[in-house]
């Protein structure tokens, strides 16, 4: 992630939006791991967003915020909009587009290489990198799908 953000010149306090964050994965973990990140976790379920706020307060994380909202209501620009288990790639990019900064990136954690989902993306969304990952203790395929708006 840091490599992709650095390529955009976003080493200093990049703004991340974790869509459908639920209990804070991966948003809260990223906020803990890198205090320079400004992480906002948005969820349509109020108690989930409230939990993120409680985590931020309990762990004294000024760089973590929980928001009770629908992602399509988000208009503040974010350098990286990410999701772990939110929607198809097409729905994820469509619903979160208003929250993406002009040079921003989307990042989605998926299971198997999502060839059909990639093929269903609108022409203005470009997949520029798919990174296979392994999760210790989990015998399953996972990958990170990096996307951006075409220039």
Locate the predicted segments by residue.
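Conserved SAM/SAH cofactor-binding pocket of Class I
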Residues: 1-83, 93-94
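Conserved beta-strand signature within the Rossmann-like core of class I S-adenosyl-L-methionine
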Residues: 103-113
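Active-site capping/gating segments
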Residues: 112-151
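Conserved beta-strand segments of alpha/beta enzyme cores
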Residues: 38, 63-65, 105, 126-129
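Hydrophobic pocket-lining residues within nucleotide cofactor-binding pockets
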Residues: 71, 86, 135
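A short glycine-rich, Lys/Arg-flanked "PGG" loop and its adjoining helix->strand segment in the class I
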Residues: 93-104
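Short, solvent-exposed amphipathic alpha-helical segments in soluble enzyme
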Residues: 56-57, 97-99, 122-123
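Short glycine-rich anion-binding loops that position phosphate/pyrophosphate groups of nucleotides
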Residues: 22, 85-88, 112
């Amino acid at each position: 992630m840091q490599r992709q953000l650095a390529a955009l010149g976003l080493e200093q306090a990049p703004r991340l939006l974790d869509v459908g964050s639920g209990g804070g994965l991966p948003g809260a973990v990223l906020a803990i791991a890198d205090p320079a990140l400004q992480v906002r976790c948005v969820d349509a379920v109020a108690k989930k967003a409230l939990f993120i706020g409680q985590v931020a307060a309990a762990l004294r994380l000024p760089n973590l915020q929980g928001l009770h909202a629908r992602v399509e209501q988000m208009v503040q620009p974010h350098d990286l909009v990410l999701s772990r288990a939110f929607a198809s790639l097409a729905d994820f990019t469509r619903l979160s587009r208003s929250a993406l900064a002009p040079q921003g990136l989307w990042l989605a954690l998926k299971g198997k290489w999502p060839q059909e989902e990639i093929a269903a993306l609108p022409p203005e969304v470009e997949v520029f990198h798919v990174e296979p990952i392994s999760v210790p203790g989990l015998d399953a395929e996972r990958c990170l799908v990096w996307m951006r708006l075409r220039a």
